[in-house]
Curated annotation (Swiss-Prot):
This is GTPase Era. It is a peripheral membrane protein. Residues 60-63 are annotated as: G3. Signal peptide: none annotated. Residues 121-124 are annotated as: G4. Disulfide bonds: none annotated.
Amino acid sequence: MKPTYCGYAAIIGRPNVGKSTLLNQLLGQKISITSRKPQTTRYQILGVKTFKDIQVIYVDTPGLHASTERTINRYMNRTARGALRDVDAIVFVIEPHWESQDAWVLDNLKEIETPVFLVINKVDKIKNRAELLPLIEKVSSLYAFQKITPLSAKTGDQVGTLEQAVHQLMPESPFYFPPEQVTDRSDQFMASEIIREKLMRLLGQEIPYSLAVTLIEFRKEEKIIRISAVIWVEKKSQKGIVIGKGGERLKRVGTNARLDMEKWFGKRVFLQLWVKVKSGWADNERLLRELGFEE
């Protein structure tokens, strides 16, 4: 019987460097929400890619950041660091410049023996690739990376090169997931994340991270899925911002989310949304656990 190869690769980096976009590009479909806002990803999400006799389970993580003032930030840091345990490869994503937060993330890797690939993302914004040479020289002096790959997660340029390099580190093992499975997350989780993505994209900087989404109904019928969700905010003033004048903004969120859900689930979706206030949820450990955040 022909051997198979299977293992885990964690995708890490500071917030807003394109980790989720990279995961979606590697998988060839969207499973992790994206926006221009830092810290869009709050949970550890597994993306499964099976190619012939190789299966890679990519671990998308929240952005690692030095600021731990808020309880929610500490939760996300613990989630990201936890993803580094027992993986076979680490993909460290940066932008085409080195920042102090990148150095802070790198410090978290120096005690880990797992091979680290450095990805320089967003090179589609660079006119002359020669501009990257000083950065490559600098980062090469900081750490013995397995490979340094400039790429564009947005366009897919050179993503295949990274994927082939990751494949070479996967140990011989049975597949952990059926070949057709693409994520470990439930349909309910995907529905709530789609809603949160549409909120973050429409709200601009008005309510950066003071919202969460929970489902109160998810019912699959023969031809339709019925979903009811609550959008939680921290202050009464934020409730009005989310709803918008005459309910216009909430209606747009619902329409955009429903269209994405119908693509994901392959059937019609009936979606109802409510907005409620839960004061201080982002700094309350009990409330964070209730809203699905992991230790």
